[in-house]
């Protein structure tokens, strides 16, 4: 039976305050249920109503045409995302409202009002046009977390160019692969970026990448660090010089709803990166609405999502979602612990952040650094917290709730993917009770199903399987850029006719979904299928443990043995006695079947630059492989892998 066993029990339930509930957009479980049923029964009526809150140059003739894997949304409708994110607000009192509040790692501040941003975006749209960029051309953006990244994205959408943002932490090789795949005409980069007090050599990486990626005709360089950088006359241009010469009026291109908006690459475990393609109308409508309801956005909110624009979270919930809602969005350039581990909390207090959205990996780091750091700050402006990027273990959830939210801020634990475009499963903060470790319920219009290996629905509560989506939703990816076969093979071949997320999940008796991690992060131990996330959660619940990553290694008797890589909190030291204590602890929390066969202490875990643990590398290390295979372009610190190999 291809079913995931779920073994970690977390029974506590938390409710939003009456005061929060009264003010929320969706105020009760009953209201959620009524709207959800309508969104499933009449998706065209529901999404047509939502899309009507935005501006369309020409109305659609049909809201939804066709079905998975190739639905079309808002057919015949014409709109422009930058118009909806900027022009719509500039015509109202929001004209002089802060759109982007930015802080650089060294401490500089910039505030761009909606009017400022509108003018800058139009200027840069004209710059792109003068460089020969036309509708449908691809533009690669390789920048630090600075306002110019958002300006460049919005300028592309204004003229119908397709942007491909590449995370500034990626290597020259990873950048070259992504430029070549998209056949980008223009590259936008900076002389460098600041990270932990050092300088990231973006221009140097760009020059290296362009030796291999020859489609690029022009490189626009933002002066960020003032470093001397190599220069290719005729090809390279300073951002500020081009902007000085550009007019600040550029009419938005009228875009068909299904025309391409952006490509964003996700790393496959092997082979070349996948270029996920999102289109204009459906993506715009869905991120607008999810941002509004999941974060319960109000006009007075100061909203901060800590993601980098190089990831989908940065696209949907740093730039597009907040600006479509006329919100104030905070951008921060640097590391959470630079110069000290309270940098995030300083920013929260300084700007009066009300809604805060970050990753579980960051929360576990905050736990490791101790309560003293957030304890130095008031944090009383916060009213709502969120998590994104991976399942959050109950221990980290409870710490976040009590230490950062002071027990008064609801937490939205959001499940979604690059491919889904927007949040798919979550609690709505005024409507739902929260269960630590459970993402929550499907967002409007989202119809999940948990299937076993034989494509049968898993009916029993708390029995796991593959998380699939059975109906189209507006912001889903439309294809893999240049590779339609890979699109079908990757997402629609495992369970015919439905979208397969690659994640395992279970649904409890109340309809709450718990995400069990990637299906390929499932262990088969003596015929039992165990989700790695549950064993990791049990380990992290031990007071000595800061972080844990669990993988399987081949075992002649059990099929797979359980290997746990563990980092300890400050004040705890590795010992054989602690190893035994941790093994016994897991056996007690989950059951003897989940007792790790081996525990390896380490000072750090190998992570991608977005903070996800690279379990694939840990599997290779656990199996004793001397050479690390597969794509490691997203690995943040290679020395971690070397130290783990030496300690093997």
Swiss-Prot record:
Q: Which reaction is the catalytic activity of this chain?
A: acetate + ATP + CoA = acetyl-CoA + AMP + diphosphate
How is the protein modified post-translationally, according to the record? Acetylated. Deacetylation by the SIR2-homolog deacetylase activates the enzyme.
Q: Which InterPro entries match?
A: Ac_CoA_lig (IPR011904), ACAS_N (IPR032387), AMP-bd_C (IPR025110), AMP-bd_C_sf (IPR045851), AMP-binding_CS (IPR020845), AMP-dep_synth/lig_dom (IPR000873), ANL_N_sf (IPR042099)
Record carries keyword Acetylation: yes
Explain the purpose of this protein. Answer: Catalyzes the conversion of acetate into acetyl-CoA (AcCoA), an essential intermediate at the junction of anabolic and catabolic pathways. AcsA undergoes a two-step reaction. In the first half reaction, AcsA combines acetate with ATP to form acetyl-adenylate (AcAMP) intermediate. In the second half reaction, it can then transfer the acetyl group from AcAMP to the sulfhydryl group of CoA, forming the product AcCoA.
Q: Which HAMAP family match?
A: Ac_CoA_synth
State the protein's name. Answer: Acetyl-coenzyme A synthetase
């Amino acid at each position: 039976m291809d079913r995931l066993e779920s073994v970690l029990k977390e029974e506590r339930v938390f409710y939003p305050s009456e005061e929060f509930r009264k003010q929320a957009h969706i105020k009760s479980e009953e209201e959620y249920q009524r709207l959800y049923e309508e969104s499933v029964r009449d998706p065209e009526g529901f999404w047509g109503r939502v899309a009507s809150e935005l501006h369309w140059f020409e109305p659609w003739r049909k809201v939804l045409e066709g079905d998975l894997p190739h639905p079309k949304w808002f057919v015949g409708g014409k709109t422009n995302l930058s118009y909806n994110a900027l022009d719509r607000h500039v015509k109202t009192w929001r004209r002089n409202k802060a759109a982007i509040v930015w802080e650089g790692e060294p401490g500089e501040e910039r505030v761009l009002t909606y009017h400022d941003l509108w003018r800058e975006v139009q200027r840069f749209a004209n710059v792109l046009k003068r460089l020969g960029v036309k509708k449908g051309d691809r533009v690669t953006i390789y920048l630090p977390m600075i306002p110019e990244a958002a300006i460049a994205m919005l300028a592309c959408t204004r003229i119908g160019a397709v942007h491909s943002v590449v995370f500034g932490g990626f290597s020259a090789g990873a950048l070259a692969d992504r430029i070549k795949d998209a056949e980008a005409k223009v590259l936008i980069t900076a002389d460098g970026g600041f990270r932990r007090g050092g300088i990231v050599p973006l221009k140097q990486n760009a020059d290296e990448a362009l030796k291999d990626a020859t489609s690029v005709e022009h490189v626009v360089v933002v002066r960020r660090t003032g470093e001397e950088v190599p220069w290719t006359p005729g090809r390279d241009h300073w951002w500020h010089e081009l902007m000085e010469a550009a007019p600040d009026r550029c009419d938005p291109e009228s875009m068909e709803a299904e025309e391409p908006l952006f490509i964003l690459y996700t790393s496959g475990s092997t082979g070349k990166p996948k270029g996920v393609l999102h289109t204009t109308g459906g993506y715009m409508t869905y991120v607008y609405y999810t941002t509004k309801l999941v974060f319960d956005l109000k006009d007075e909110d100061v909203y901060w999502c800590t993601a980098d624009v190089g990831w989908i979270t940065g696209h949907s919930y740093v730039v597009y979602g907040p600006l479509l809602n006329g919100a104030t969005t905070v951008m921060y350039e640097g590391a959470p612990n630079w110069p000290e581990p309270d940098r995030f909390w300083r920013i929260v207090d300084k700007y009066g952040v009300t809604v805060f959205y970050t990753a579980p990996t960051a929360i576990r780091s905050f736990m490791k650094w101790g309560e003293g750091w957030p304890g130095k700050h008031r944090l009383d402006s916060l009213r709502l917290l969120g998590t994104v990027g991976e399942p959050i273990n109950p221990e980290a959830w409870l710490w976040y709730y009590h230490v950062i939210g002071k027990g008064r801020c609801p937490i939205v634990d959001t499940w979604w993917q690059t491919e889904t475009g927007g949040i798919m499963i979550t609690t709505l903060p005024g409507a739902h009770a929260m269960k630590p470790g459970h993402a929550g319920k499907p967002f409007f219009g989202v119809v999940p199903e948990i299937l076993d290996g034989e494509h049968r629905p898993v009916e029993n509560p708390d029995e796991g399987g593959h998380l699939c989506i059975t109906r189209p939703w507006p912001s889903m990816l439309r294809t893999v850029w240049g590779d339609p076969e890979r699109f079908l093979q990757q997402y629609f071949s495992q369970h015919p006719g439905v979208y397969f997320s690659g994640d395992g999940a279970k649904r409890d008796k109340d309809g709450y979904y718990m995400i069990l991690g990637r299906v390929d992060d499932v262990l088969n131990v003596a015929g039992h299928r165990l989700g790695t996330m549950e064993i990791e959660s049990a380990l992290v619940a031990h007071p000595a443990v800061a972080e844990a990553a669990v993988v399987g290694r081949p075992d002649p008797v059990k099929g797979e043995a359980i290997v746990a890589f563990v980092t300890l909190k400050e004040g705890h030291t590795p010992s054989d006695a602690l190893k035994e204590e941790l093994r016994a602890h897991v056996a007690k929390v989950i059951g003897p079947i989940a007792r790790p066969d081996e525990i390896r202490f380490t000072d750090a875990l190998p992570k991608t630059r977005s903070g996800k643990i690279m379990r694939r590398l840990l599997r290779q290390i656990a199996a004793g492989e001397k050479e690390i295979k597969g794509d490691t372009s997203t690995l943040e610190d290679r020395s971690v892998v070397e130290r783990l190999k030496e300690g093997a």
